[in-house]
Amino acid sequence: MARTTPIERYRNIGIMAHIDAGKTTTTERILFYTGVSHKIGEVHDGAAIMDWMEQEQERGITITSAATTCFWRGMDGSFPEYRINIIDTPGHVDFTIEVERSLRVLDGACAIFCAVGGVEPQSETVWRQADKYGVPRLAFVNKMDRAGADFLRVVDQIRSRLGGSPVPVQLPIGAEDEFKGVVDLLRMKAIWWDDSTQGMRFSLGDVPAEMVAACVAWREKMVEAAAEASEDLMEKYLEGGELTVEEIKRGLRVRTLANEIVPVLCGSAFKNKGVQAMLDAVVDYLPSPVDTPPVVGIGEGGLESSRKSCDNASFSALAFKIATDPYVGVLTFIRVYSGVLSSGDTVYNPVKDRRERIGRLVQMHANNREEVKEVRAGDIAAAIGLKDVTTGDTLCDPKDVITLERMEFPEPVISVAVEPKTKADQEKMGIALNKLAQEDPSFRVRTDEESGQTIISGMGELHLEIIVDRMKREFGVDANVGAPQVAYRETIRKAVEQEGKYVRQTGGRGQYGHVWLRIEPLDPGGGYEFVNGIVGGVVPKEYIPAVDKGIQEQLQNGVLAGFPVVDVRVTLFDGSYHDVDSSEMAFKIAGSMAFKEGARKASPVLLEPIMKVEVVTPEEYMGDVVGDINRRRGIVQGMDEVPAGKVIRCEVPLSEMFGYATDLRSATQGRATYSMHFEKYVEAPTHVADAVIKKSVS
């Protein structure tokens, strides 16, 4: 089966934004205008196509990134057909993992900002994630019809708060109730949308007289930005030559793909204005799979290898999401980077060292499935029938192996104990939690060895609430949930050298392992580093991995309060062995003993997670809010003014933030809002550390 759309006409994009910026509504409009849905679904009716989990429809927020495909021929029907694969990503901070994994497999993104709220905390988080993966993006300033809408203020914030280089390619005609349409600066034409056809029809007109001067000035800035794309455009521009619309588009495209600029558009998705022009911009400025660099990975023999986005290269794909479907079982969402995959093919998973057969292939339209026989380079699809694949695994041609770079997932910062309400549900709960953990790498399940309780950990209170909710709905398990626990860590402050010796002489063969370790602190975020400093074979090399393993096991149980130890480097620099009695087990125990003893002497300290918190409050409550933040050991880092009042930016220990939503509501009569995300670990003050240690010992 030949390709229906050339790969140059593919656009794999994500829609990313702060919660409530209107992301899902924008996606719904895209599906409406591209003809996928014939009736617009509204989020506030709980009818949005992209929000297909029950909890999403109840809460009005997007939790999982649904993928969908649509086709676009341009606003005026003049384009050849483009295939746009859209991933709608959640804007709530507890689900940043969904955003992270979407960005890893996208080629471009549309960042949606609220014209009133502007750049909000989650916008910064998502923008940083897009920077990390080098994703070219354009910005759409939504909700231009709302009271307090200010397009140029948002453009300014993209520059000052996100460090982007925004280039407006449109200006709004009016704002708030007076928002009528936009001026297309390329063609210097006003675009008016027809309300009676839900914005399906539009007309072009002259720029309103009172806007001509502003439009000329902003167009000049846009043309200059485009001219910087190449020497010949710059030369033509400097010599006073007029750049054609096509040349401006080409220049803007080159610079957007290089992540040098961000084209900015505006509109109101809810009022059906501006979304088709944004789709045109997706085609004009965002990359196709062939515009992105070849994907890089590790090939046979550990050498770096790369794959071009084309059908005749060997097959390679990345599994970026696992979802359980009540009808077909496990769906594995994949992004195909190269080659062709047909249903029935066998693929190799180098991460798990397993071959698997692809049962069926489906392309998703939110939660509707369309079965396809094959997928090609650039496609996003879901495979049914894969048994042992987790998020971030590579799938490739068994004859031409490549391992693509894995995704990095944040460590959970909050834990709660859960137990089923009836003993009979114990096994069901275990199965449910393991399935949910397979879907979501930022969610962990473990059993506390001392208490025997099941502990679940995640990125925030809402994250865990939704997990417990899904357990009840999808698996029929009712659970009691304990009080939230903070995920503390431990580290050391000074370097020590420590001996560990494990000797057992019982009749017959004994046990003998002997090591010397140098244990030293690393900078925050350094993790764990093991260095083999053995010379002359005083510890045989077959026992060295066992020493490392023993240390890693001991790292999980810190010496102060049993929390994981982070940011340490351990060097194995000496030791001895016995020809007969030495074994891997003996060296593992010796390594573990040496680390435990050494950590005690290395000035261990307790680390606590610090959250970055932003509170938006009406001015009259500001004193109370700041006072409360100070009482919670928070440090205020700055304040901004917004139409809703004041934005207070601060850092607060997570342990002080439980129940904050309720307290903030009562202090401000429900008028303030806040958002928070994990920022860093810092050393806990002595009185906090003492209390935590005392509690863990008791």
Swiss-Prot record:
- Where along this sequence does the record place binding of GTP? 17-24, 88-92, 142-145
Record-linked SMART domains: EFG_C, EFG_IV
PANTHER family, per database record: RIBOSOME-RELEASING FACTOR 2, MITOCHONDRIAL, TRANSLATION ELONGATION FACTOR G-RELATED
Protein location: Cytoplasm
Where the record annotates domain tr-type G, the positions are 8-290
Which cysteine pairs are joined by S-S bonds? none
What species does this protein belong to? Methylococcus capsulatus (strain ATCC 33009 / NCIMB 11132 / Bath)
| Gene Ontology CC | cytoplasm
**What is the organism lineage in this UniProt record?**
Bacteria, Pseudomonadati, Pseudomonadota, Gammaproteobacteria, Methylococcales
Keyword terms, alphabetized: Cytoplasm, Elongation factor, GTP-binding, Nucleotide-binding, Protein biosynthesis
**Protein name, per record:** Elongation factor G 2
Q: What are its GO biological-process terms?
A: ribosome disassembly
What the entry lists under InterPro entries is as follows: EFG_II, EFG_III, EFG_III/V, EFG_IV, EFG_V, EFG_V-like, EFTu-like_2, G_TR_CS
Coiled-coil residues are none
Q: Name one GO molecular function term.
A: GTP binding
Protein's job: Catalyzes the GTP-dependent ribosomal translocation step during translation elongation. During this step, the ribosome changes from the pre-translocational (PRE) to the post-translocational (POST) state as the newly formed A-site-bound peptidyl-tRNA and P-site-bound deacylated tRNA move to the P and E sites, respectively. Catalyzes the coordinated movement of the two tRNA molecules, the mRNA and conformational changes in the ribosome.
Check the record and name the PROSITE patterns matching this protein: G_TR_1, G_TR_2
Q: Which family does it belong to?
A: Belongs to the TRAFAC class translation factor GTPase superfamily. Classic translation factor GTPase family. EF-G/EF-2 subfamily.
